Amino acid sequence: MPIDTSLEFVPINIAIITISDSRTKENDTSGDTLEKRIIDAGHQMIKRTIIPDDVSKIKDTLNAMSKEKDIDCNITTGGTGLTGRDTTPEAVKEIANKHIDGFGELFRQVSFEKIGTSAIQSRAVAALINSTYVFCLPGSTGACKDGWDEILQYQLDIRHKPCNFVEIMPRLNEK
């Protein structure tokens, strides 16, 4: 993927929200994986939290964190599967200002290359909520690695060409 090395890297402020009824700080390997990659890329880790698989709690947390001025991007892990408790996509759809449909499509393509037709079970989504990016990844560590390594590390790097999410951040509130 083309990175224009003549440009200076611009770090953004990122928060991680783990959505799970069973994960704790001690066993949140997906959150750990994302945090390491975010920091290694040069971005700022602003906040990290774990919340239950509850659509109201997910909506409340995403709404609140998307209004925090020091957070540019929320990355969630968990709750994107097909079980009854997997409600992250539903919560995001209810409160999103704009949907970033291509993220889920590209994530499933990347997943297909790694896990074949099992990729169809992923409901990874992305959106803008209050002009803050929200990327919702599955709860597996492998899926978080793939989502970051194959998509987000590039789209959250202003040097990535021909376009990226960072360069349009100043224009997200345009009317």
Language-model-detected regions and their locations in the chain:
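Non-catalytic beta/alpha edge segments that cap or flank active sites
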Residues: 1-175
